[in-house]
Amino acid sequence: RYPREDYVLTDKLSGSYFKKEEDIRPFFESQLAACGVDYFDFYLMHSQSTTNYQHYRDCRAYETAFALKAEGKVRHVGISFHDRAAVLEQILTDYPAIEVVQIQFNYLDYDDVAVQSRKCYEVCRRHGKPVLVMEPVKGGSLVNLPDDAKAVLDALHGGSPASYAIRFAAGFPGMLMVLSGMSSMEQMQDNISFMRDFKPLDETERAAVEKVQEIFHSKDLIPCTACRYCTDGCPKHISIPCLLYTSDAADEARSV
């Protein structure tokens, strides 16, 4: 329907889909076939962390991906990352040919001791790697704000809560792309409206975002992004993110 070069297509190699090096190419070819394309613009080693990185090394997943790039079946090889900055430093040192890194990056996690958004971003910059941003609105947490936090942003010049969160992330040097999960046409139109003629946050907006940070931290809310990975492995199929959201909402109601 549209020329292939007119859109960017990304896929990922998840560790659960291969047990040995020989499994990777057939799986990759099945991904191309499923998408009906001859190549992927980006191919990411999925969810790299201390728990699975060695599996990728043992199965020569990176070497296979680099070979696929040499064959023209992948334009850029990268990783999506979910761990501490020191682990990212090790991976980029081990594999300097990695071209792009996808990290969780938003204003609430910027200095979070567990997520380490800022530190991971700084590692990417030191290694000269462009960044793909995931979770810029933290699974909707930075859209569905507590009333007092929403009031801070409402006092600005009319942007949506999502707009301030996404512009915060996109305003840093080296950000190649900001991935925003959208579930309605209205959300897409909102994103397009402020990214078409992009402007980073000004000083007043940044101060407001910092105030929202302070409000969130004062409430001690559960830092769930609603990625739902936990539900996939739950033997009872419990909707864990919904329960955590309900718990946070109840705590917020009691504090009013």
Q: Across the structure, where does each feature detected by a protein language model lie?
A:
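Iron-sulfur (Fe-S) cluster-binding segments and ferredoxin-like electron-carrier domains
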Residues: 236-247
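Single conserved hydrophobic/aromatic residue that forms the stacking wall/gate
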Residues: 245-256
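Acidic (Asp/Glu)-rich catalytic clusters
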Residues: 2-4, 32-36, 91-96
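Active-site groove signature of glycoside hydrolases
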Residues: 35-51
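Beta/alpha (TIM)-barrel catalytic core signal, keyed to glycine-rich beta->alpha loops juxtaposed to Asp/Glu
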Residues: 48-223, 229-238
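N-terminal binding-site loop/beta-alpha segment at the start of enzyme catalytic domains
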Residues: 1-7, 38, 64, 70
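Glycine-rich anion/phosphate-binding loops
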Residues: 18-26
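A short, structured active-site edge motif that brings together acidic residues
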Residues: 6-17, 43-48
